[in-house]
Each structure stands twice: as structure tokens, then as C-alpha cells.
A protein has these predicted regions:
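Short loop/turn motifs that connect adjacent beta-strands in outer-membrane beta-barrel proteins
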Residues: 18-20, 44-54, 78-87, 113-121, ...
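Outer-membrane beta-barrel transmembrane domain signature
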Residues: 98-179
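Gram-negative (and chloroplast) outer-membrane scaffold detector with strong preference
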Residues: 40-96
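Residues that define the transmembrane beta-barrel architecture of outer-membrane proteins
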Residues: 4-8, 35-39, 65-71, 100-106, ...
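Residues on the lipid-exposed face of transmembrane beta-strands in outer-membrane beta-barrel proteins
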Residues: 10-14, 41-45, 71-77, 90-92, ...
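Short glycine/proline- and aromatic-enriched beta-strand/turn motifs that initiate or cap beta-hairpins
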Residues: 1-30
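Transmembrane beta-strands of outer-membrane beta-barrel pores
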Residues: 27-31, 58-62, 77, 90-96, ...
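Signature for the C-terminal beta-barrel architecture of outer-membrane proteins
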Residues: 3, 29-35, 47, 51-52, ...
Length: 187
């Protein structure tokens, strides 16, 4: 199977005194309409100083995407001025309506802001267990997905107002056995 080549993403990350909330919504387009949609909502809970937090997450979408519920622990590192950092999460993953619903997932995220905040290199990497079939019917047990992103942060330029919080950028997808695909792909 092939996936649409155009995807739009809306995302939000918001830290607070009890941890942080992150969500995103992806919509893939075919012809002139949305062909599929997917979203994740994740919460880090932390009532202590250590860099470990409790992670809870919901993932879901339309078409071939099954609802998933995840819980685990996250280690987070940020440097003092928050120009670079990473996190690593180890989670139990329950995939609703899957013949083998009890699974695991490892997720790593990173960010690097440079050029006086004008540019950012961000992304994530997921590795999980999920019994599924590719579009050609081949059975798979493990999936890998990484999406490095490069952003131009428009509010960091002198001509933009500080409240103009808009970034434009690009994303690459490196995957193995993801969605209906069979084997390794770079999109």
C-alpha cells in the first residue's frame, strides 16, 4: 500500500507545575480530501523534583488505526536554557480490537533550538509491538517510526512580533512495517 504524500499537523506542548500535556492531530490527504486522521494526547504527571514522570497516553484515528491506551514512565532532560533536551518513555500499550492487545512501546523525543532561536531540529522515535498485517497481507509484530523535523521559528526574526507564535517546516518519516507498509521506507 501507499500512503498520501501530504500531511498537515497541529500540535501543542504545554508544561505546568504538575508535568506537561502534549497532543497532535495529523491529517493525510488524497486528491482533494482527508484520507485518514490520527491523534495522540499524552500527559506527564510529576509531583516531585526527579526527572522521572508518570506517562499516560491515548492514541486513535480513523480507517485502519486502532485506539491505544498507554501507561509507563518517562525520563526527561533539558539543559539550563531549554535550547536542547530529550525524553525517553517505556510504556505498556493496550491496543483495542487487536487479537494480541497487550503490547509495549518505547518512545524517544528530542529538540535543539539554534541560530538564536530562529531554527529548531525536533522529532521523535517510536518502537512498539503490535501484531498487524501490511497492505500486501504480510504479518508483522514490530514497528519502528521516526519523524525528524526542521522548523523556522518566525517569531524569532526581528520583523516579527514576539506574540507571533508560528513556525513553518518540514518532516521526514523513517519507518519499518508502519501502517499498511511492508519493510523500511523514507517519506
Amino acid at each position: 500500500g501507499t500512503r498520501p504524500s501530504l500531511t498537515t499537523t497541529v500540535e501543542m506542548f504545554k508544561p505546568d507545575k504538575w508535568g506537561s500535556t502534549f497532543f497532535f492531530v495529523d491529517m493525510d490527504y488524497a486528491k482533494n480530501e482527508v484520507a485518514s486522521a490520527y491523534w495522540e494526547l499524552a500527559r506527564e504527571l510529576k509531583f516531585w523534583k526527579a526527572p522521572i514522570s508518570v506517562h499516560v497516553e491515548y492514541d486513535g484515528g480513523i480507517n485502519y488505526i486502532k485506539d491505544s491506551y498507554l501507561a509507563g514512565a518517562t525520563y526527561t532532560f533539558n539543559n539550563k536554557d531549554f535550547t536542547k533536551g530529550f525524553s525517553a518513555s517505556v510504556m505498556y500499550k493496550y491496543i483495542h480490537s487487536n487479537p494480541s492487545p497487550n503490547n509495549f512501546q518505547f518512545t524517544a523525543t528530542w529538540y535543539l533550538h539554534f541560530g538564536q532561536g530562529k531554527y529548531s531540529f525536533t522529532g521523535f522515535m517510536d518502537f512498539w509491538r503490535e501484531r498487524h498485517n501490511s497492505g500486501n497481507g504480510k504479518s508483522h509484530l514490530l514497528t519502528f517510526l521516526a519523524e525528524p523535523q526542521f522548523w523556522v521559528n518566525l517569531n524569532a526574526f526581528p520583523w516579527a512580533d514576539d506574540d507571533f507564535k508560528l513556525s513553518v517546516g518540514t518532516e521526514w518519516e523513517v519507518s519499518s512495517n508502519f501502517a499498511l507498509m511492508d519493510g523500511w521506507y523514507l517519506n
